[in-house]
């Protein structure tokens, strides 16, 4: 098992995600509010250091609506990212598999992991433990960032995953465990 120093603290992991997102320089940041994502989201919200003119940051009510918005932004050639929890993967599959996937749209998401080590909410485990299998079954490419990944690689992996989505013209998600598991 890796030590806390190897995997970093919540603050360090969140900052690594922020650094990766800033390297992408998204013009649109869509998100579902989450206490797990607080440090990442407050960076981009008004008053945060990542808030800037021309960057549109807004909450979305459901994951599938985020996929629709991301698809439109991809068609318009805009850099965009959606940030949400893995327990929302089930909600977005129909939207994902009927528009951006078959029409080769490079939608990109940062998906925070729930249900692993350090999870405090027992009901989350059932859906979250199946995230990778659901994405694999749907043919969606994903990359994993957790305690096994050196913290120094997180930002570059996020940036490369975004480039991968743009190059391959398909949806890509980065699964990020901010809770340390």
Describe the residue ranges of each PLM region.
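Thiamine diphosphate
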Residues: 1-181
């Amino acid at each position: 098992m890796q030590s806390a120093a190897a995997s970093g603290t919540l603050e360090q992991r969140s900052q690594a995600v922020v650094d990766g997102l800033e390297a992408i320089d998204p013009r649109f940041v869509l998100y579902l509010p989450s206490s797990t994502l607080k440090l990442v989201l407050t960076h981009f919200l008004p008053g945060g250091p990542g808030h800037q003119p021309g960057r549109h940051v807004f909450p979305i009510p459901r994951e599938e609506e985020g996929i629709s918005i991301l698809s439109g932004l991809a068609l318009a050639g805009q850099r965009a990212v959606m940030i949400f929890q893995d327990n929302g993967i089930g909600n977005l599959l129909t939207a994902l598999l009927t528009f951006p996937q078959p029409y080769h749209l490079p939608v990109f998401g940062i998906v925070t992991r729930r249900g692993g080590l350090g999870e405090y909410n027992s009901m989350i485990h059932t859906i979250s433990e199946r995230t990778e299998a659901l994405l694999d079954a749907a043919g969606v490419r994903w990359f994993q960032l957790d305690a096994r990944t050196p913290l120094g690689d997180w930002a570059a992996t996020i940036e490369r995953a975004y480039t991968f989505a743009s190059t391959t013209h398909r949806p890509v998600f980065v699964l990020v465990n901010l809770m340390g598991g």
